[in-house]
């Protein structure tokens, strides 16, 4: 709820300042994640068993003539693929050159298509033409092939712009899968179908799906006991690893007294760690994950300072100081909270420098320049609000493209990723490639649509929805409908940039895709789960960071 807070500040010679404030609900987690209480001895035993099982799987399963499609799919869905990257790559290469044109099994054809395309292999969508009738429609006989429909539905989300056959496949499968759920709730696949209709695999956060699929796989009579044991143990071991990380970050948050020093800002440290966990969960990215979580936490405070608390004069001073990035600027900042913020920002980046090797510092400098850029964008938006100015959509996007923070966060996500990120990577990023622009605009639109209900409760910065309504003279409903259409197109453009050969290594692109998946979870269905933590987000955090899997 918006209100005006009047402050008497000794730092401002007892001036009375009227400032907009927004009431954000406090953290729903309290100190739950502050302490890490897990037996290290028990964890070591589990890790040793995981390593044993990995070797067994490599020797007995991956080296056999097992059903390759099913094996790859299970490894990925169970969250185990990061242990078998080279083995899966070899299997996919074999699948890509094999002769499968005579296969008329809808499930297998769709699965092969999805597995290859999501890994960047070139595979034509024309393979689905054989499932159409003489009128050009998908055959009615396919309606009874439920597993085939579900497989085709998942494959259709890997479409490129202009692939009408996959658009038709999505419409066809969605219609009939919804009917199956509505009319056959006891169907063996009904739970999987409901989950897929809610969030298809292409948009699903990998660890969340692993948690869901392990229970599905266990009920499958044909499941491999070794794979199931490995999946459960590995999930629990990773959960312990992540909880330990989170406790470190929570102590950092607590020791800096962010909640006390910036009471006007959202206290969402757990949600932010979950956000970054969706970007990369693997143990080898621990350094990158912790660094990025701290940066996104600082960014959230910055966003709330510019959007919901600071006066235009204060923000102008802060913006200029950030551009100089010099601790000597701190004395010129008034009131006290600005000095506190500025000191924390500069000291945090100094801490990051100490964690990096000398030859890695150029990555942090690049990320720092992106932080300066986002601050300039925040100030421009604050100026619009202060002047009551509603820009045209194209003018708005020149600023809000930056202010959504996406490019800065992607750049920062690369800082701690060790040698795979090079000068060439950052040069690629600086040229704003299609996958970056598509994912950034997708993020911008979903954020604006999702946070619209809350923003309307206060005097807020103009959104892309507002600008679209003004520029095209349409209703709010029509504007949102059009922006959602663009979101669909952006997903297709993201898919296109995974086609091999890629300009940058695959893990670089995966970070962008994973950021987009998290955005989909936080803002889908026109809701802002970050500002107002809802049931869906809480349950997701419970699943990954609280509830272990019974062995």
Swiss-Prot record:
DDXXD motif, short sequence motif: residues: 303-307
GO process terms (BP): diterpenoid biosynthetic process
Binding site for Mg(2+) 3: 447, 451, 455
Keywords carried by this UniProt record: Lyase, Magnesium, Metal-binding
Catalytic reaction annotation: (2E,6E)-farnesyl diphosphate = (+)-valencene + diphosphate; (2E)-geranyl diphosphate = (4S)-limonene + diphosphate; (2E)-geranyl diphosphate = beta-myrcene + diphosphate; (2E,6E)-farnesyl diphosphate + H2O = gamma-eudesmol + diphosphate
EC class name: lyase
Binding-site positions, (2E,6E)-farnesyl diphosphate: 266, 303, 307, 444, 447
Pfam families associated with the record: Terpene_synth, Terpene_synth_C
Cofactor binding comment, as recorded: Binds 3 Mg(2+) or Mn(2+) ions per subunit.
Pathway this chain belongs to: Secondary metabolite biosynthesis; terpenoid biosynthesis
Domain of life the protein comes from: Eukaryota
Binding, Mg(2+) 2: 303, 307
GO molecular function, one term: magnesium ion binding
Cofactor: Mg(2+); Mn(2+)
Binding residues for Mg(2+) 1: 303, 307
EC number annotated for this UniProt entry: 4.2.3.73, 4.2.3.16, 4.2.3.-, 4.2.3.15
Protein family membership: Belongs to the terpene synthase family. Tpsb subfamily.
Known function: Involved in sesquiterpene olefins biosynthesis, constituants of cannabinoids and terpenoids-rich resins. Catalyzes mainly the conversion of (2E)-farnesyl diphosphate to gamma-eudesmol and valencene. Can also use (2E)-geranyl diphosphate as substrate with low efficiency, producing minor amounts of myrcene and limonene.
Domain comment (free text): The Asp-Asp-Xaa-Xaa-Asp/Glu (DDXXD/E) motif is important for the catalytic activity, presumably through binding to Mg(2+).
Protein name, per record: Valencene synthase TPS8FN
Organism this protein belongs to: Cannabis sativa (Hemp)
Encoding gene per record: TPS8FN
């Amino acid at each position: 709820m918006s209100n005006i807070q009047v402050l008497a500040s000794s730092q401002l010679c007892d001036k009375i300042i009227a400032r907009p404030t927004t009431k954000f609900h406090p953290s729903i987690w309290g100190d739950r994640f502050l302490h890490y209480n897990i037996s290290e001895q028990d964890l070591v035993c589990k890790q040793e068993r995981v390593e044993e099982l990995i070797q067994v799987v490599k020797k007995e399963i991956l080296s056999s003539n097992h059903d390759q499609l099913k094996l790859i799919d299970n490894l990925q869905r169970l969250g185990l693929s990061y242990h078998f990257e080279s083995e899966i790559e070899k299997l996919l290469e074999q699948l890509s050159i094999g002769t499968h044109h005579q296969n008329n099994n809808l499930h297998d054809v769709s699965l092969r298509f999805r597995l290859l395309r999501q890994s960047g292999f070139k595979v034509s969508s024309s393979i689905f033409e054989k499932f159409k009738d003489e009128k050009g429609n998908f055959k009615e006989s396919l309606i009874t092939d439920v597993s085939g429909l579900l497989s085709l539905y998942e494959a259709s989300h890997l479409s490129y712009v202009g692939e009408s056959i996959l658009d038709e496949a999505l419409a066809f499968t969605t219609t009939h899968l919804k009917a199956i759920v509505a009319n056959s709730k006891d169907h063996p696949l009904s739970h999987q179908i409901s989950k897929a209709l809610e969030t298809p695999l292409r948009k699903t956060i990998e660890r969340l799906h692993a948690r869901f699929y392990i229970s599905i796989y266990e009920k499958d009579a044909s499941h491999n006991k070794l794979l199931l044991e490995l999946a459960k143990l590995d999930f629990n071991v990773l959960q312990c690893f992540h909880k330990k990380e989170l406790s470190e970050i929570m102590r950092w948050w607590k020791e800096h007294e962010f909640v006390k020093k910036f009471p006007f800002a959202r206290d969402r440290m757990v949600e932010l760690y979950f956000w970054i966990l969706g970007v990369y969960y693997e143990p080898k990215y621990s350094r990158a994950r912790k660094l990025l979580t701290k940066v996104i936490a600082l960014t959230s405070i910055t966003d709330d300072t510019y959007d919901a608390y600071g006066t235009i004069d204060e923000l102008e001073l802060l913006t200029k100081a950030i551009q100089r990035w010099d601790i000597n600027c701190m004395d010129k900042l008034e009131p006290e909270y600005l000095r506190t913020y500025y000191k924390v920002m500069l000291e945090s980046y100094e801490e990051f420098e100490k964690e990096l090797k000398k030859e890695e510092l150029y990555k942090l400098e690049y990320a720092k320049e992106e932080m300066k850029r986002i601050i300039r964008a925040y100030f421009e938006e604050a100026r619009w609000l202060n002047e009551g100015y509603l820009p045209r959509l194209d003018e708005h996007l020149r600023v809000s493209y930056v202010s959504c923070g996406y490019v800065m966060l992607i750049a920062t996500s690369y800082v701690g990723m060790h040698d795979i990120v090079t000068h060439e990577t950052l040069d690629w990023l600086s040229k704003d490639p299609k996958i970056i622009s598509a994912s950034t605009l997708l993020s911008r639109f979903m954020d604006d649509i999702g946070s619209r209900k809350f923003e309307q409760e206060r005097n807020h910065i103009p959104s892309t929805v507002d600008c679209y309504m003004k520029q095209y003279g349409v209703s709010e409903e029509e504007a949102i409908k059009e922006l959602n259409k663009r979101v669909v197109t952006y997903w297709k453009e993201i898919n296109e940039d995974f086609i091999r050969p890629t300009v940058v290594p695959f893990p670089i692109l995966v970070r962008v895709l994973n950021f987009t998946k998290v955005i989909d979870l936080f803002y889908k269905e026109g809701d802002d789960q970050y500002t107002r933590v809802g049931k869906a987000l809480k349950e997701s955090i419970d699943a990954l960071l609280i509830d272990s899997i019974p062995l």
